[in-house]
C-alpha cells in the first residue's frame, strides 16, 4: 500500500524509494540510503508511511496536509547521510469521535476518504473509529424486526446528525434518508475497511450499547427505560440489561 500512497502523492515517485518491511516487537521506521535511492524501512505499512512523511518533511522540505495531499518531489531526492531510526512503545494511536463523523465527514465520498486514510497512515494512526454504514445495519435489523420503511426513517437521523443519534441523543432528525444513501454507505464502508486492512490499520467498529427506538416497548414488547429529552429532542429508549 505504501507504493500506492507514493503514486497518489506524486505519480512515478514510488520508483525513487526502496520500501522494506521487517519484523519487530515494537513499531518503528528507519531512513537509509542505497545508491541513489532512499530506503524507508518499518515493521508494517503504517510505520513505513510515517517514515515517508518524516522524510518528506525533514529531508525534502515537503509538508502534506488535509488540503494538500499531493506534491512534486525533486528529480533527485535528498540523500539520507546516515541511518535514522524512530520507534514507539505507544501501540494504540486512536483517531476520531462520533461528532467528527457528523461535523466534518458526513458527506465524504471515497476520493476524500482515500486521502484521509493515507493521512492517517502518514501520521501513524492505527486505530480509527469507523462508523460509516452503521445506519445500514440499523435499517436491516429494524426491517427484520418488522418495522416499516416509514418507521425506520423516523428513527434513523440524517447524515449531519448521526453522531448524536448514535450517542443516543435523538431520533430521526435531519431525515429521512433516500434508499440510495444506504446503498452508497454500505459500499463506501466496505472500501474504507478494505483499505484500512491493507495498511494494517484496525478499524474500531461500533458495538451495541442498548439503544432501541423509543417505541420498542409497544412495538416489540421489550423492557426499556425512557431517557426523556435531550436539548428538546426525543431520545431513543434504552434496553434494560435484565430483559431476556
Language-model regions: role of each:
Residues 1-90:
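Contiguous, structured surface segment used for ligand recognition
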Residues 21-25, 34-41, 45, 70-71, ...:
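Aromatic-lined carbohydrate-binding surfaces of glycoside hydrolases
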Amino acid at each position: 500500500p505504501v507504493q500506492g500512497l507514493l503514486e497518489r502523492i506524486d505519480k512515478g515517485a514510488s520508483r525513487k524509494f526502496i520500501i522494506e518491511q521487517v519484523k519487530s516487537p515494537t513499531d518503528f521506521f528507519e531512513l537509509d540510503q542505497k545508491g541513489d535511492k532512499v530506503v524507508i524501512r518499518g515493521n508494517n505499512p503504517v510505520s513505513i508511511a510515517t517514515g515517508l512523511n518524516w522524510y518528506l518533511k525533514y529531508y525534502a522540505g515537503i509538508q502534506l496536509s488535509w488540503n494538500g495531499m499531493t506534491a512534486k518531489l525533486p528529480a533527485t531526492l535528498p540523500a539520507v547521510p546516515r541511518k535514522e531510526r524512530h520507534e514507539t512503545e505507544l501501540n494504540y494511536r486512536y483517531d476520531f469521535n462520533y461528532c467528527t463523523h457528523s461535523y466534518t465527514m458526513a458527506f465524504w465520498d471515497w476520493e476524500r476518504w482515500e486521502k484521509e486514510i493515507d493521512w492517517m497512515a502518514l501520521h501513524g494512526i492505527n486505530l480509527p473509529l469507523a462508523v460509516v454504514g452503521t445506519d445500514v445495519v440499523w435499517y436491516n435489523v429494524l426491517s427484520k424486526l418488522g418495522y416499516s420503511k416509514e418507521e425506520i426513517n423516523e428513527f434513523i437521523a440524517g447524515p449531519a446528525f448521526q453522531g448524536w443519534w448514535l450517542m443516543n441523543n435523538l431520533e430521526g432528525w435531519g431525515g429521512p434518508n433516500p434508499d440510495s444513501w444506504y446503498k452508497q454507505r454500505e459500499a463506501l464502508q466496505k472500501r474504507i475497511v478494505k483499505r484500512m486492512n491493507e495498511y494494517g490499520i484496525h478499524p474500531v467498529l461500533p458495538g451495541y450499547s442498548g439503544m432501541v427506538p423509543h417505541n420498542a416497548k409497544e412495538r416489540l414488547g421489550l423492557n426499556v427505560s425512557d431517557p426523556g429529552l435531550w436539548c428538546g429532542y426525543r431520545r431513543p429508549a434504552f434496553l434494560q440489561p435484565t430483559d431476556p
